[in-house]
Amino acid sequence: MRKLFAAACAALWSVATLQAQPAELRFRDDGTFRIAQFTDMHLDPSKPRRLAESEKTFARLERVLTSERPDLVVFTGDVVTGAPAEGMWRRLLDAVERHGIPFCVVLGNHDAEQDLARAEIARIVTSYDGSLNRLADNGELADVELTVAGRVSDRPAWAFYCLDSHDYSTIEGIDGYGWFFPGQVEWLRACCTARTEANGGRPLPSLAFFHIALPEYVAAWRNPDNSHIGRAAEDECPGVLNTGMFAAMAATGSVVGTFVGHDHDIDYLVAEKGICLGYGRFSGDNTTYNNLRPGVRMLVLTEGARGFETWIREDDGRMVDHARFDEGKITEISVER
């Protein structure tokens, strides 16, 4: 009965997620897979000064794609936040497409606050050959499950979940940022359960990417017993309601890391109940508030391992907060290089 319920929830949440993955992701010959997370770029052409700052952001994108050579690019929200927005979206995605790198976009709370609605942004994003996004039944970006094949085998070795954490509360009398809907929680649970069954009863290691932090981030960062790295120069602004997404992730045993943005002055990783709760690094420039050096979070997976390596690449080329997450613990490799 539980399996039937989970399957029904998954089907109801988004038919689009049942479609075949549009582009193959595969581990390299050396057994690694590299991900670049760009977050809160806040590209804005609305004024000359903001456009000039956005040019710096485009230059950063180009440098990282050239130097780090990621196998996947994930944009975790608040990508284009000024009008006219379409030209900025196309310029951004054209750049990734020129490098031949697949990408996935999740939206933030500010992406639809200019001259494009969420469905209009979704049509632009999904028009690219390299896009791993799909349209949901409502015309917006669907939550998607992506899999990475092994070097030789076509069987999935890892999975990624790119999820919509929405924008603001939709309940009268409750103010604050958005949260995952119950259907999304059950969809993720169903996906992870199905992958475990297909993997001979062993949970398939996976990462989740979204914009707004889970409520569990707050207590996890403040727990002195949790291993961690990075900094928080502001308080977290998680979704105002807790609908059980973290509990679902922990219960399935599949998700080993979550990566968000939203809070520009936070870039920490903290281990909580076997899951690495992580932030990217603010990847934009002076079109919005920021007090950290702009940068990009890199993630490196190894086929056959449940852990991962990560660092932040800053503008001057420095690698900072180089760490490894394995067996539920964050271990610092180096602070700066």
Please place each PLM-identified region on the residue numbering.
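N-terminal active-site segment of His-dependent metallophosphoesterases
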Residues: A20-R91, A95
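Extended active-site neighborhood of metal-dependent phosphoesterases/phosphodiesterases
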Residues: A23, R90-G201, M298-T302
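Metal-dependent catalytic neighborhoods of phosphoester/phosphodiester hydrolases
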Residues: P48-R49, G77-A95, A112-G130, A220, ...
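Active-site-proximal beta-strand elements of phosphoester/diester hydrolases
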Residues: T32-P45, A157-D167, F209, I275-F282
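Active-site environment of divalent metal-dependent phosphoester hydrolases
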Residues: D44-S46, T81-P84, V105-L116, Y168-I171, ...
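His/acidic metal-ligating clusters that form di-metal
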Residues: R69-D71, A159-C162, I174-D267
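Binuclear metal-dependent phosphoesterase catalytic core
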Residues: A23, D29, E145-D154, M245-A250, ...
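Bacterial N-terminal signal peptides
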Residues: A6-V15
